[in-house]
């Protein structure tokens, strides 16, 4: 029986490794054509074969990446548009959004989640893990909302790409991920591109942009990284329903956001600075702005002033769209981490930067935060895409090496069992 089990494992391993052997054959064909002095057209055809093979074997993850890319870009755009309308009331928008997420996730989970979850998962308490994730997410949301208020659209796309090296570092440190040289090279290409862009932008005068708020936005990436790693650890140990996880996290965030409310009293926040004695008034004005469309801050406000001007007319529509795309973003992110890994999510998320920069060119997408196209954006787009391709090549090499090691181990185990049977 043990011999048969080993034989089945070998068959499964060989089946999983088949696509890598086909890739090897394509590479060898390409090397042969180069040695034989193949034409330029033949070399191009060989490259397209490799690309087609990669896409065909990973069609699901590429479709999922396109869906995630679309949702993530729209989520970021509507977050910025919401802040431009009601940027004085970030706490109100954050709490309202958490409440909407909690209600929606609990309704859907009560209808569909219980049928999918097993009895062990339903009866086990994960409150500590849910609370940890909610604390990390709450820190990230508050910091991101503050940072986005004075961070221009183009710089947003650059800053968000820093999640790649941050995720790589902490996954290596905590989850014991191992990377290929090409993974590091791809990440370095992206980071260097970001550094050059930031250096260039630092010499430009941009009234809407603040280096302090840029740093706040960058700091919001660290709790996101730890939150994703916590999700992966829980998913690997227990089969937790994605809807239940997001519902409970949203519930805890209603309270964890209150713990971070004193952050708004920090004086360096300038336009977002909120003294303790004005907190309750700000909350009331925020609800009036969001649900009644009533402007409160209309005088002595604006760019460079102590306060942002309210633009509450139709704010609830923009906020509703932001909530919808953010809910979808959370679900897709959890699904990717559940079915794949934090590393896969990092690879997928790296494509949102250039897409976001280009999305800000179109008024029907960006609305009042539309930007003029710049050559610098296309330079960074090339850097992002080139770095992402190099990163993916490193991942393919690691996957191929892992498959071969498993196949060799199964082969050795089969030979050992055969020898023992013959000896007996």
From Swiss-Prot:
It is found in: Membrane; Vacuole membrane. Changing residue 145 to I: No effect on chloroquine and piperaquine binding at pH 7.5. Decreases piperaquine binding affinity and increases piperaquine transport rates at pH 5.5. It holds the Pfam family CRT-like. It is a multi-pass membrane protein. The keyword Transferase does not apply. It comes from the Eukaryota. It catalyses: L-arginine(in) = L-arginine(out); L-lysine(in) = L-lysine(out); L-histidine(out) = L-histidine(in); Fe(3+)(in) = Fe(3+)(out). GO terms for cellular component: vacuolar membrane. Disulfide bonds join 289-312, 301-309. The chain crosses the membrane at residues 59-83, 90-111, 127-147, 153-173, 181-202, 211-236, 242-263, 315-339, 344-361, 375-397. Keywords: Amino-acid transport, Disulfide bond, Ion transport, Iron, Iron transport, Membrane, Transmembrane, Transmembrane helix, Transport, Vacuole. The record marks 207 as: pH sensor, predicted to act as a hydrogen acceptor for interactions that may accelerate progression through the transport cycle. Not involved in the proton transfer pathway. One of its GO terms (molecular function) is xenobiotic transmembrane transporter activity. InterPro entries: CRT-like, Transprt_Chloroquine. Residues 84-89, 148-152, 203-210, 264-279, 293-314, 362-374 are vacuolar. GO terms for biological process: amino acid transport. Can function as a drug transporter. Can transport chloroquine and verapamil. Active transport of chloroquine and arginine requires a membrane potential and a directed pH gradient: 5.5->7.5, corresponding to the digestive vacuole pH gradient of the parasite. Binding with chloroquine and piperaquine is inhibited by verapamil, amodiaquine and excess arginine. Can transport lumefantrine or mefloquine. Belongs to the CRT-like transporter family. Nutrient transporter. Substrate transport is pH-dependent. Can transport arginine, lysine, histidine and peptides. Involved in maintaining the osmotic homeostasis of the digestive vacuole. Required for the normal asexual intraerythrocytic proliferation of parasites. Can transport Fe(2+) and Fe(3+). Monomer. This is Chloroquine resistance transporter. It comes from Plasmodium falciparum (isolate 7G8). The lineage of its organism: Eukaryota, Sar, Alveolata, Apicomplexa, Aconoidasida.
